[in-house]
């Protein structure tokens, strides 16, 4: 009664309904324009990073002195999921992941409280703290500074001109500086002169520190005015620093008496090279969590344009990575597909209905339903991305279905009875099928509930897709019984109408087939179930995967060399690699390689680890057909570089892999234990085992040994005899090698560290280090070798920990087979061939974890959804057998999807699972339409056989229209090769394949099966 009242109200108040529709279009358009746009939904976890630096410390010292104390404080935080860390030379990165229910600001407050309590107990000189509020996908914009200025000047320009301006943009978390040289004022002492004059490193450090600060002395009043008194003691230039006095036993000396003061660079932990030409400086814009990427990048371009007049002559800012380009391509793919689908659907409507007015009446629901979806997307704080817009592409056919049923029925009633008033005829026709339409849409919505329950990365990725579908369907639900009856009353005519050529042709084919199936019900039903069982037996032979790889366009070539490589050797190697690629691969537009660590410490790499960003010219200009061929061509150009590990990834893919497991790769095998040597040996064995498995690609384990360490162990008794303290010894050695930072002073717009450091060639020879001598308190030069033991040892590049345990990781990508079967085989091979020592254990991580979690969730929730739909069908038809008969569409729909996946070599993935869910809804909806009409005819007093034959023929058009519209809506996805189409293609394959078998069941098997049931039970 309520549905009939809504229809009646809409037809009586047509002006109000039309005004409401116009308002929906207006607010929908507004929401579409003002909703943020991004490539993907925000899939990042609630994550807090702590970056701490202690210059000159080895990985083991960083682990023992910083990471372990922090772990004791940070483990067991409320809502914490995991705590992992990596310690390298001079720096540690601690990452804490929280449950998604924990607010990021609350998480940071919790971490900050614990961090503050432990920081005071950490060694003197520890720098850093919590990283900015960024996510693993915050790298949205990268550029280099090129031109005829020095690398120090480039870095100064980036750090103190460009970076402050870009950080002012709303949504920018920070701008990371990579490469170049950071300027420092360096005091270069002559140790012989210092010994002769009786000056120690501590004396020099104290004198410099005192003289680098101005201070205030108070206020002075004169004639009613106040003057603030400032004592100008700070030395702010090289000349001023040279004039600083140092007190000694021989009197007061100037620094320039025993040292030079020069402008040099600080010790570097990394560098950036470009196109094989030389070094450059890179800027990396990081976005805040939940920020509008497109808007940020637009403002970044505007700000860079404003800065152009202030750049030195001949200097340019060159962008080599812009996330918005990928976003625009992905959105363009979905938009193009959406437009193509709408065009195909409108053509299909006209072919089936043969009436332009009826086609218009149906087509009205599309812009209105999409507008409703955009309004809810905006209200839900979602973004317009590949998944949310992709959901609308998937839903496009389903949005039309209910309108098709309403208009088609009204069209039939008006054509059959021209004597009844048009409004009354439309009211009766809409009332007749209102329950079926509403229950059909509700059924489809219920089928998408399982997607809304997904957890983890797969939930964040696919929930927006399901949400946009549900929003659009809710719009359709209301519009089908309000605006569609009104539009039908305005555009349809009460005139007789003959069938179109297409429907006559289809009826001629269908009628004899239907007769055969109805006359031989038992034989055809038996044959159908044999087909069903045979088709379902394909399931074990269809591979399983989490998600198809998405082509981002640009690639990242990861390069890993021997851990002991020096900075200069690493730089020369990368320049040679870039030159080789540029020489042999003409499709490469630019190469930017970054080696080592960045300024913020968000991307810790050793001097042996390089991420090489490679951009290509337009694909139409390539000499090869596919991207895989192009990547093979790049690897072929590098065949002369022996002993180096090369592997390919993509900018976003790389960060997602790191986010999931802390490393890159489809599969990550984590080995936990205490001894680094044992972990290294086990990693090597597992890597060899994985290489023997079919489908393994780019199997790598981190080269975690082979770094040369020079252990200097002071003899405290010997030092006491000559009057040298441990603190003085440490400061001396640090000043002789890396440099001892004393303070930071303002120099114009920049801030420059002042440090004590010996000539750089001291660090170039172990012999020279052994010959170093420091001044005792008696003014005597004491060789280091006489008071300390110096030995060369091998040590780790880094120490990785997870949940307070050391670990090593072996990673592998998978090509040519599905991920699920590869992981199962890998587990079996490792269990058979790798013997673990006591207290050592292995875990597996990577993309397959998401798939397993999704499968587990869906295997629980989908049966519950089917049960819910059974109850909806039962309350609709008041019959358990009829409800079960309609649900029989589901397994037959599955068979078509499985056959289609098997035929084209696609895997069962989360997108394919979404396709099956969409398919279930369409299949059940068709069953509802068919069985509902059979029941209606039966209640009119017709015989069972007459009901089946007449009803099936009359419902041929709506069933085929529904299937064709749903299929054609997805057809553009099947043939699209644009950015982002890889994710949607498995879904389209499943739906198109399943529509064939489910439509065949609806049209050919449901009639005889209904006939058998109706003859045995009474249908009310």
Model segments located where?
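Hydrophobic transmembrane alpha-helices and their membrane-interface caps
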Residues: 28-33, 343-412, 453, 471, ...
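Solvent-exposed, non-transmembrane alpha-helical starts
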Residues: 19, 58-65, 101-110, 139-142, ...
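Transmembrane helices with small-residue packing motifs
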Residues: 15, 22-61, 117-123, 451-461, ...
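Signature of alpha-helical transmembrane segments and their immediate interfacial
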Residues: 2-37, 431-433, 499-548, 588, ...
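Helix-loop junctions and hydrophobic alpha-helical segments within the transmembrane domains
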Residues: 320, 327, 331, 407, ...
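Solvent-exposed, membrane-proximal periplasmic/extracellular interface segments of envelope transport
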Residues: 62-133, 192-213, 234, 568-663, ...
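Extracytoplasmic/periplasmic membrane-proximal domains and adjacent transmembrane bundles
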Residues: 9, 40, 51-53, 119, ...
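Transmembrane alpha-helices and their membrane-interface boundaries in multi-pass membrane transporters
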Residues: 396-410, 433-453, 460-498, 612, ...
């Amino acid at each position: 009664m309520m549905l009939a009242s809504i229809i009646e109200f809409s037809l009586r108040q047509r002006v109000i309904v039309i005004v409401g529709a116009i308002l929906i279009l207006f607010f929908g358009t507004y929401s579409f324009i003002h909703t943020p746009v991004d490539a993907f939904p925000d899939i990042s976890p609630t994550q807090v990073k702590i970056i701490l630096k202690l210059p000159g410390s080895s990985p083991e010292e960083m682990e023992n002195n910083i990471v372990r104390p922090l772990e004791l404080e940070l483990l067991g935080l409320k809502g914490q999921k995991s705590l992992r860390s990596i310690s390298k030379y001079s720096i540690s990165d601690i990452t804490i992941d929280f449950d998604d229910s924990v607010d990021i600001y609350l998480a940071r407050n919790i971490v900050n409280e614990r961090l503050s309590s432990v920081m005071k107990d950490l060694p003197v000189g520890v720098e850093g703290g919590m990283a900015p509020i960024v996510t693993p996908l915050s790298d949205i914009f990268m550029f280099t500074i090129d031109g005829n200025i020095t690398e120090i000047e480039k870095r100064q320009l980036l750090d103190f001109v460009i970076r402050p301006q870009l950080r002012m943009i709303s949504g920018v978390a920070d701008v990371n500086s990579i490469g170049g040289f950071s300027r420092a004022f360096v005091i270069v002492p002559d140790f012989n002169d210092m010994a002769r004059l009786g000056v120690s490193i501590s004396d020099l450090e104290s004198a410099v520190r005192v003289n680098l600060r101005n201070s205030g002395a108070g206020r002075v009043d004169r004639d009613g005015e106040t003057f603030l008194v400032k004592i100008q003691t700070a030395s702010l230039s090289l000349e001023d620093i040279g004039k600083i006095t140092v007190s000694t036993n021989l009197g007061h000396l100037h620094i320039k008496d025993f040292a030079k003061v020069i402008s040099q660079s600080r010790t570097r932990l990394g560098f950036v090279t470009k196109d094989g030409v030389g070094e450059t400086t890179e800027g990396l814009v990081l976005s805040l969590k939940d920020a509008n990427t497109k808007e940020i990048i637009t403002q970044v371009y505007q700000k860079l344009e404003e800065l152009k007049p202030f750049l030195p002559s001949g200097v340019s800012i060159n962008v080599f990575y812009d996330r918005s380009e990928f976003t625009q391509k992905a959105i363009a793919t979905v938009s193009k597909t959406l437009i193509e689908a709408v065009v195909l659907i409108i053509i299909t409507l006209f072919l089936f209905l043969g009436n332009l007015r009826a086609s218009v009446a149906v087509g009205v629901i599309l812009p209105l339903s999409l507008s409703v979806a955009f309004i809810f997307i905006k209200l839900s704080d979602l973004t317009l991305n590949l998944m949310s817009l992709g959901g609308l592409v998937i839903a496009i056919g389903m949005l039309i279905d209910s309108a098709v049923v309403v208009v088609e029925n009204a069209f039939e009633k008006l054509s059959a009875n021209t004597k009844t008033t048009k409004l009354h005829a439309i009211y009766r026709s809409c009332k007749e099928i209102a329950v079926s339409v509403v229950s059909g849409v509700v059924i489809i919505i219920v089928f998408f509930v399982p997607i809304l329950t997904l957890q983890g990365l797969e939930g964040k990725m696919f929930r927006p897709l399901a949400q946009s579908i549900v929003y659009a369907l809710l719009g359709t639900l209301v519009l089908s019984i309000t605006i569609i009856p009104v539009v039908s009353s305005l555009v349809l005519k009460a005139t007789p109408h003959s069938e179109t050529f297409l429907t006559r042709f289809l009826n001629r084919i269908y009628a004899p087939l239907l007769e055969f199936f109805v006359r031989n019900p038992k034989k055809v039903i038996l044959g159908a179930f044999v087909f069903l069982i045979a088709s379902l037996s394909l399931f074990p032979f269809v591979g399983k995967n989490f998600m198809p790889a998405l082509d981002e366009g640009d690639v990242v070539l990861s390069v890993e060399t021997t851990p002991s490589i020096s900075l200069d050797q690493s730089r020369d190697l990368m320049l040679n690699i870039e030159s080789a690629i540029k020489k042999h691969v003409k499709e490469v537009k630019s190469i930017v390689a970054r080696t080592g660590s960045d300024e913020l410490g968000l991307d810790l790499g050793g001097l042996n680890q390089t991420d090489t960003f490679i951009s290509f010219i337009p694909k139409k200009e390539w000499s090869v057909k596919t991207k895989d061929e192009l990547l093979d061509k790049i690897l072929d150009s590098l065949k002369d570089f022996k002993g180096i590990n090369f592997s390919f990834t993509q900018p976003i893919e790389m960060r997602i892999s790191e986010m999931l497991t802390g490393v890159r790769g489809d599969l990550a095998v984590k080995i936990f234990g205490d001894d680094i040597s044992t972990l290294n040996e086990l990693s090597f064995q597992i890597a060899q085992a994985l290489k023997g498995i079919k489908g393994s690609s780019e199997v790598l384990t981190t080269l975690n040994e082979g770094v040369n360490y020079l252990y200097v162990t002071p003899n405290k008794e010997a030092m006491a005899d000559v009057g040298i303290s441990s603190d003085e010894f440490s400061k001396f050695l640090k000043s002789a090698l890396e440099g001892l930072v004393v303070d930071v002073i303002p120099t114009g717009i920049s801030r420059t560290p002042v440090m004590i450091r010996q000539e750089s060639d001291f660090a170039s020879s172990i012999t020279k280090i052994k010959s170093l001598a420091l001044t005792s308190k008696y003014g005597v030069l004491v060789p280091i070798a006489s008071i300390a033991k110096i030995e060369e040892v091998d040590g780790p590049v880094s120490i990785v920990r997870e949940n307070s345990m050391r670990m090593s990781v072996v990673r592998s990508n998978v090509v040519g087979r599905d991920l699920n079967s590869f992981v199962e085989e890998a587990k079996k091979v490792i269990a058979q061939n790798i013997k673990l020592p006591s207290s050592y254990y292995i875990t597996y991580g990577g993309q397959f974890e998401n798939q397993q979690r999704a499968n587990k969730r869906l295997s629980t929730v989908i049966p519950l959804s089917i049960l819910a739909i059974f109850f909806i069908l039962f309350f609709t038809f008041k019959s358990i057998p009829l409800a079960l008969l309609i649900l029989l569409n589901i397994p037959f729909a599955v068979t078509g999807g499985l056959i289609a996946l098997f035929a084209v070599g696609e895997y069962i993935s989360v997108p394919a699972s979404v396709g099956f869910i969409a398919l279930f809804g369409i299949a059940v909806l068709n069953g509802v339409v068919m069985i509902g009409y059979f029941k209606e005819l039966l209640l009119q007093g017709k015989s069972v056989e007459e009901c089946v034959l007449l009803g099936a023929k009359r419902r041929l058009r709506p069933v085929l229209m529904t299937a064709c519209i749903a299929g054609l809506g997805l057809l553009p996805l099947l043939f699209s090769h644009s950015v982002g189409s890889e994710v949607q293609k498995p879904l389209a394959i499943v739906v198109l394949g399943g529509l064939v078998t489910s439509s065949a069941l609806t049209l050919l098997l449901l009639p005889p099966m209904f006939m058998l049931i109706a003859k045995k039970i009474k249908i009310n």
